[in-house]
Amino acid sequence: MATKLDYYAVLEVTRDANGDELKKAYRRLAMQYHPDRNPGDASAEARFKEINEAYDILKDEQKRAAYDRFGHAAFEGGGPGAGGFDFGGGLGDIFEQMFGDMMGGRRGGRRSGSDIQIQVSISFTEAFTGVKKPITVPTRVTCESCEGTGSADRDQGAETCPTCHGAGKVRAQQGFFLVERACPTCHGAGKVVRNPCAACHGAGTVERERTLEVAIPAGVEDGTRIRLSGEGEAGGKGAAPGDLYIHVAVEPHPIFQRDGANIYCRVPLRMSLAALGTEIEVPVVDGSRTKVKVPAGTQTGENFRLRGKGFSVLRSSARGDMYIQVSVETPRHLTKRQRELLEEFEAEAGDHERANPESTGFFSKVRDFFEGKL
């Protein structure tokens, strides 16, 4: 058996090279020794295969760790990377290796695309009315060069794996157990690419940015998660794509507050208008205005309900309400005439219980308290 070169030497990098350095070296060398650039050159083709083999191992953290520990033996028959057990991970890893594939574990079958998580900020008003938002999603999409096959030769495409014969799994005797696990050659895909696509390096997908228009329904709350099935990263070599999860962040409003489907708006009101009664015009979240009658004698904290002016309730035809909360303002700075009028008012009001029922009742209780009646 021919002696294999060190994978780090094949990629012309040091053993502490990071992922970006590995990728850069791989792309440079793969381009240099690609068979399309070296037609009929058997040595270049062999070198190209070595480069792909080395990168396939070193780009994967688990495979790289196994290679650093055991060398090429990790991926040969009986080695830890090719079916043997590595007890360094504890009992959980051992049982996952033994039973993971038979019970639908992560190693079996083609690898579906990853899910994507993205946050979208919308205004309070947009949450009220609903909105369509264009979003840019960094993702992996099907490679156009090879149409997702991962092969430079579209007609040939991927070949049936010679190890598992297309099953994606292999069986091995481990002591008393017959263990079924993902094929170490094709990693569960059932197929292998002999001539990898230069654009996607055999993955079948490439990194791109996509722009989507997302419909955010009326009534969403801060923290709502929206799932778009199949809009995640493309699966490798024909596998199913992942999903896109949009986390909605609703910006606060300077005038309105929200509690569930209900909206609250605090409206300051002059003391005189609260005493005499009035009609006020208040804003609604959708930009319209409505009038509210405030009866004479209105106190701070009283609410006036506007039915159906709140948020839509998701997956329902119901709507919340809007509440106008009155806050009676006491003037801080008075003119001489205003002070005189208030003094006249106070002298006239006196202890008149009908005019000031709450204060009269309160001070009556205070008097009873000091007299020992309470």
Curated annotation (Swiss-Prot):
One Gene Ontology MF term: zinc ion binding
Cofactor: Zn(2+)
A Pfam family it matches: DnaJ
PANTHER family, sorted: CHAPERONE PROTEIN DNAJ (PTHR43096:SF48), DNAJ HOMOLOG 1, MITOCHONDRIAL-RELATED (PTHR43096)
UniProt comment concerning the protein's domains: The J domain is necessary and sufficient to stimulate DnaK ATPase activity. Zinc center 1 plays an important role in the autonomous, DnaK-independent chaperone activity of DnaJ. Zinc center 2 is essential for interaction with DnaK and for DnaJ activity.
InterPro entries for the chain: DnaJ, DnaJ_C, DnaJ_domain, DnaJ_domain_CS, HSP40/DnaJ_pept-bd, HSP_DnaJ_Cys-rich_dom, HSP_DnaJ_Cys-rich_dom_sf, J_dom_sf
Family membership: Belongs to the DnaJ family.
Co-factor binding comment: Binds 2 Zn(2+) ions per monomer.
Compartment(s) of residence: Cytoplasm
Residue intervals passing through the bilayer: none
Species the sequence originates in: Gluconacetobacter diazotrophicus (strain ATCC 49037 / DSM 5601 / CCUG 37298 / CIP 103539 / LMG 7603 / PAl5)
GO cellular component: a single term: cytoplasm
Chain positions recorded as Zn(2+) 1 binding sites: C143, C146, C197, C200
Record-listed Zn(2+) 2 binding positions: C161, C164, C183, C186
Lineage: Bacteria, Pseudomonadati, Pseudomonadota, Alphaproteobacteria, Acetobacterales
GO biological process: chaperone cofactor-dependent protein refolding; DNA replication; protein refolding; response to heat
Span of domain J: 6-71
Protein's name according to its UniProt entry: Chaperone protein DnaJ
UniProt CXXCXGXG motif repeat ranges: 143-150, 161-168, 183-190, 197-204
Subunit structure: Homodimer.
UniProt entry keywords in alphabetical sequence: Chaperone, Cytoplasm, DNA replication, Metal-binding, Repeat, Stress response, Zinc, Zinc-finger
Role of this protein: Participates actively in the response to hyperosmotic and heat shock by preventing the aggregation of stress-denatured proteins and by disaggregating proteins, also in an autonomous, DnaK-independent fashion. Unfolded proteins bind initially to DnaJ; upon interaction with the DnaJ-bound protein, DnaK hydrolyzes its bound ATP, resulting in the formation of a stable complex. GrpE releases ADP from DnaK; ATP binding to DnaK triggers the release of the substrate protein, thus completing the reaction cycle.
